[in-house]
Structures are given as structure tokens and as C-alpha cells.
């Protein structure tokens, strides 16, 4: 049967299984779902699947039985022709995205806090609580070593239960922006407090700056566990 574009969009939203679908109908189904804002993945192995594979957001061709035309039109080639591999790939991709977001949420307030410490000291005309060499050491050694832990973080238990993330959604939600600002402000206040206390306690400038470095490192470690 021939359907209009509006009818095809309604059918695509309400029907789960289609059988004996022609190449033209496959292409129409993909376009109908995309019009409704869906991210469409299409699997295929034959020449007749090429248009729909090309149109879909993620075209997946079979590696063993797939034709060269289908492989050229696809974005991904499924080497073992096992559909369970697609689920495993989605799961791994969500895990990578989660860990990347955790790292961003962790490293942004740390870097912003260090910048606020330096800027506040410059504008206030006081001694710099942490030297440029110490900042370099924190960023190159401490941050890299601690940040590597997020790369090997295990996936969340509900990772495949969650609904798909909207492509238009920001990487860092607005709620986390306020959290980043709060942690940065706490870090800046803690650094200045310990720096001032060390100097008033009769410690040298080197000891006071070392104290600030330790404060930054301990805040990084504590906040890292919080981000997990």
C-alpha cells in the first residue's frame, strides 16, 4: 500500500515489526523516523539496503555476507555478523561517554579553582599563593595521574536501562555548572585561608606555597571520589 509522508511517520512511531519491506519503503521508514527526531540505526547486507544505510544516522553492514555496495554505504561494518555485538558496542559507548563526563566535571572546577586563586591574588595585589612551577606540576603530574582513573572506571549498573541521551543535550548539565562554580569557590577560599594562616604562623613563603599545593591535591582527590 502507498502511504503519504504523514501516514508513514505515524506508522513508524506505532509499529514495531515490518515484514517484506521493499528498498523504497526501508528508505521511507528511515526518513520518517528521522523526521520525528529519532536517531536511526540501519542494518543491511544487500545492494538493495544501500540507500537506507546511506540515509540512516548509523549504517551497519554485515562483514561476512554483506556486499561491497552495502559496506561502502555503511558507517560501521559488523565483522562477526552478530547483532549482539551492536548492543555491546552501545554499552561500551555509553560507558566511555559517562567516564568522559565524569572527567570533565572533575577537571573543570579544579582548573577553574587554580585560575581563581591566581587571579584573586593578582587583583588583590598580594603574594601569589602558588608558583607557576607548582601549577605546572599539578596539571602535568597530579591531574593526569588522577584523571587516568576515570578512563578505567567500570560502567554503571543501569547503563543499558537508561533511555537514550538526546543529541541536543549539553555534555555538562546546568545543575553541574553550579556545582563546578561552588567547588571552585571552595577551593579558592581554602587555598587563601591556609596560605594566610601559614604566613601568620611564621612559616616561610616556600612552606606556605607548599601548603597550598597540598590543599589543592587533597581537594582534587576528595572531589574525584565524589565525581565517581
Identify what each model region corresponds to:
Residues 53:
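Basic, alpha-helical nucleic-acid-binding regions used in initiation and control of genome expression
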Residues 1-42, 56, 61-228:
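Membrane-embedded transport module
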Amino acid at each position: 500500500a502507498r502511504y503519504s509522508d504523514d501516514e508513514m511517520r505515524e506508522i513508524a512511531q506505532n509499529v514495531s515489526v515490518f515484514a517484506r519491506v521493499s528498498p523504497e519503503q526501508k528508505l521511507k521508514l528511515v526518513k520518517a523516523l528521522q523526521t520525528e527526531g529519532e536517531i536511526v540505526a540501519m542494518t543491511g547486507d544487500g545492494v538493495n539496503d544501500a540507500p537506507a544505510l546511506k540515509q540512516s544516522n548509523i549504517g551497519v553492514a554485515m562483514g561476512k555476507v554483506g556486499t561491497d555496495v552495502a559496506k561502502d554505504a555503511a558507517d560501521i561494518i559488523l565483522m562477526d555478523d552478530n547483532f549482539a555485538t551492536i548492543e555491546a558496542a552501545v554499552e561500551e559507548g555509553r560507558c566511555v561517554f559517562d567516564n568522559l563526563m565524569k572527567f570533565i566535571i572533575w577537571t573543570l572546577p579544579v582548573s577553574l579553582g587554580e585560575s581563581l586563586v591566581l587571579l584573586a591574588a593578582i587583583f588583590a595585589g598580594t603574594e601569589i599563593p602558588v608558583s607557576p612551577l607548582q601549577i605546572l606540576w599539578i596539571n602535568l603530574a597530579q591531574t593526569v595521574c588522577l584523571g587516568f582513573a576515570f578512563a578505567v572506571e567500570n560502567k554503571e549498573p543501569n547503563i543499558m536501562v537508561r533511555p537514550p541521551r538526546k543529541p541536543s543535550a549539553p555534555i555538562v548539565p546546568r545543575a553541574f555548572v553550579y556545582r563546578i562554580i561552588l567547588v571552585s569557590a571552595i577551593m579558592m577560599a581554602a587555598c587563601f585561608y591556609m596560605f594566610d594562616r601559614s604566613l601568620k604562623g611564621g612559616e616561610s613563603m616556600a612552606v606556605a606555597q607548599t601548603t597550598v599545593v597540598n590543599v589543592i591535591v587533597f581537594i582534587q582527590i576528595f572531589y574525584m571520589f565524589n565525581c565517581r
